Amino acid sequence: TKATEGEFLAEGGGVR
């Protein structure tokens, strides 16, 4: 999942 630095951990991955 493409997430921001804040959502990165919340999404459990993605792109910082």
Swiss-Prot record:
GO terms for cellular component: extracellular region. It comes from the Eukaryota. It is found in: Secreted. Conversion of fibrinogen to fibrin is triggered by thrombin, which cleaves fibrinopeptides A and B from alpha and beta chains, and thus exposes the N-terminal polymerization sites responsible for the formation of the soft clot. The soft clot is converted into the hard clot by factor XIIIA which catalyzes the epsilon-(gamma-glutamyl)lysine cross-linking between gamma chains (stronger) and between alpha chains (weaker) of different monomers. Its main location: secreted. GO terms for biological process: adaptive immune response; blood coagulation; innate immune response. Cleaved by the protease thrombin to yield monomers which, together with fibrinogen beta (FGB) and fibrinogen gamma (FGG), polymerize to form an insoluble fibrin matrix. Fibrin has a major function in hemostasis as one of the primary components of blood clots. In addition, functions during the early stages of wound repair to stabilize the lesion and guide cell migration during re-epithelialization. Was originally thought to be essential for platelet aggregation, based on in vitro studies using anticoagulated blood. This is Fibrinogen alpha chain. It comes from Tapirus terrestris. The gene is FGA.
